[in-house]
């Protein structure tokens, strides 16, 4: 198969993914065992060796950067960001990083049981059966309910507690009232679920015993007809005096109301009382509940799980925006052919059967390591090769493809051979900074080829 045909098939894969033609300039088509160390186009020289075909120019990299930003749904790259090492010490980014690692490790393997209290429920739980990935301090960082929500959502956003000029403390006790800025949530996102996470450290409390049970309740703060505060209960969770770890409370109804009417966002209030004394509120500090003045890694935070609109836009739409950008940012290109910009070579290899090849896009080469946290690059892979008779078992051929191959042998001019195409696709999670306060995790479905076959 010729280098030209291999590249054409790679273009077809990229076009089907909505990435556009220009992203081809940023891929490395290498066998899985080979790692590209420089951005450019790599080809097989016919001797099972991968060689550099063309180095990316600065203009190429600029085009690629525009394409990836549009692909991520971001108007422009974030600037003036703190280092990952500093930002990832905070509780909310650490949660998303944990989610990212779980998605990459378990993609395609998470079949969750039904949960009656999943969407917009009023009951929350502690999920004490979760394994302790980072020791006792990070108990229940990712719960079974989270795993279900992760599977159902495309976008996961975290919100750290912030001080708002219109938010006063209630009942003169610091730490009970929290406020989250949700103004960055796009209007076309559908809310699947929202959770509040607060950290309990029994070693900091008064009652270090399992015999003392407490109920933690979270309320949405509203404004009554006379301008007075109202409190609508959202959910509750029971805990004990000796518990150390994260508590999870469902706040879906609260976040939904704030997204519909932003002026109604007056924050939430956290109440606590002994199970046997519901009429008497206890201090949060007495049961070791951590409030907003503690270390970054134990700060309370809110998680929003969303279903976004189609995240990968049509190629035609992408091309339209590229044309507009070209008009507003004209760049002169050299017309002469240089060693780094030559036509694709003629075929140097024999025809190969349908198989998976490596297609790699390196984010780090664009200088985006300061805002894209993970991954460093995009290993998409693509399907390439012929579907010739006989179709072997490793070609994953459908019954129809087998029949079509036989008919092609009889009528080669009337019936084409089956096509080499993906048979299984996986998701690509991307973790990135919006700014110093917000980190997003987007999951792009059907972005990574897992296997190929003849169809």
Curated annotation (Swiss-Prot):
Skewed-composition ranges (Basic residues): 318-336
Localization per record: Secreted
Composition skew (Acidic residues), residue ranges: 108-118
Propeptide: 37-335
GO BP term, example: follicle cell of egg chamber development
Record's keyword terms, sorted: Cleavage on pair of basic residues, Cytokine, Developmental protein, Disulfide bond, Glycoprotein, Growth factor, Secreted, Signal
Disulfide-linked positions: 354-420, 383-452, 387-454
Region spans: Disordered: 108-138, 316-345
Tissue specificity: Expressed in cells of the developing foregut and hindgut during germ band retraction and later embryonic stages. Expressed in the wing disk, mainly in the posterior compartment in the pteropleural and medial regions extending into the progenitors of the scutellum. High levels are found within the posterior and anterior compartments of the wing pouch and low levels in the hinge region. In the eye/antennal disk, expression is highest anterior to the morphogenetic furrow and in the medial regions with lower levels of expression posterior to the morphogenetic furrow.
Subunit structure: Homodimer; disulfide-linked. Interacts with nord and dpp.
Function per UniProt: Required for the growth of imaginal tissues and for patterning of the adult wing.
Protein name in UniProt: Protein 60A
Organism: Drosophila melanogaster
Lineage: Eukaryota, Metazoa, Ecdysozoa, Arthropoda, Hexapoda
């Amino acid at each position: 198969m010729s280098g030209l045909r291999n590249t054409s098939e790679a273009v077809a894969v990229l076009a089907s993914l909505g990435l556009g033609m220009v992203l081809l300039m940023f891929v490395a088509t290498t066998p899985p065992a080979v790692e590209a160390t420089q951005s450019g186009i790599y080809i097989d020289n016919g001797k099972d060796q991968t060689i550099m075909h063309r180095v990316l120019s600065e203009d190429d990299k600029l085009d690629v950067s525009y394409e990836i930003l549009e692909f991520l749904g971001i108007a422009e790259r974030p600037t003036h960001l703190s280092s990952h090492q500093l930002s990832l010490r905070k509780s909310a980014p650490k949660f998303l990083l944990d989610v990212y690692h779980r998605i990459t490790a378990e993609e395609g393997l998470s079949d969750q049981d039904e949960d009656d209290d999943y969407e917009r429920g009023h009951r929350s739980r502690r999920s004490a059966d979760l394994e302790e990935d980072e020791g006792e301090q990070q108990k229940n960082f990712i719960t079974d309910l989270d795993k279900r929500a992760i599977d159902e959502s495309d976008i996961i956003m975290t919100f750290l507690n912030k001080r708002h000029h219109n938010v006063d403390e209630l009942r003169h006790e610091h730490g009970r009232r929290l406020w989250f800025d949700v103004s960055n949530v796009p209007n076309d996102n559908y809310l699947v679920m929202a959770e509040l996470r607060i950290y309990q450290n029994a070693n900091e409390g008064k009652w270090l015993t399992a015999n003392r049970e407490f109920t933690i309740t979270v309320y949405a703060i509203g404004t009554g007809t006379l301008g007075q505060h109202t409190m609508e209960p959202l959910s509750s969770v029971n805990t004990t005096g000796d518990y150390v770890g994260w508590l999870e409370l469902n706040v879906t109804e609260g976040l939904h109301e704030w997204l519909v009417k932003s002026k109604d966002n007056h924050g939430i209030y956290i109440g606590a009382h002994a199970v046997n004394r519901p009429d008497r509120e206890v201090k949060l500090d007495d049961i070791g509940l951590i409030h907003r003045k503690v270390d970054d890694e134990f700060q309370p935070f809110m998680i929003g799980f969303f279903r976004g609109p189609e995240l990968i836009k049509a190629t035609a739409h992408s091309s339209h925006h590229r044309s507009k950008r070209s008009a507003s940012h004209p760049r002169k290109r050299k017309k002469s052919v240089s060693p780094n910009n030559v036509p694709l070579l003629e075929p140097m290899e024999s025809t190969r059967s349908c198989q998976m090849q490596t297609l790699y896009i390196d984010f780090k080469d664009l200088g985006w390591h300061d805002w894209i946290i993970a991954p460093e690059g995009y290993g998409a892979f693509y399907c390439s090769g012929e579907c010739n008779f006989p179709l072997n078992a490793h070609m994953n051929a459908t019954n129809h493809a087998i029949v079509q191959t036989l008919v092609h042998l009889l009528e080669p001019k009337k019936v084409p051979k089956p096509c080499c195409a993906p048979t299984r696709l996986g998701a690509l999670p991307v973790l990135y900074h919006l700014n110093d306060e917000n980190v997003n995790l987007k999951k792009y479905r059907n972005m990574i080829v897992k296997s190929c076959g003849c169809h």
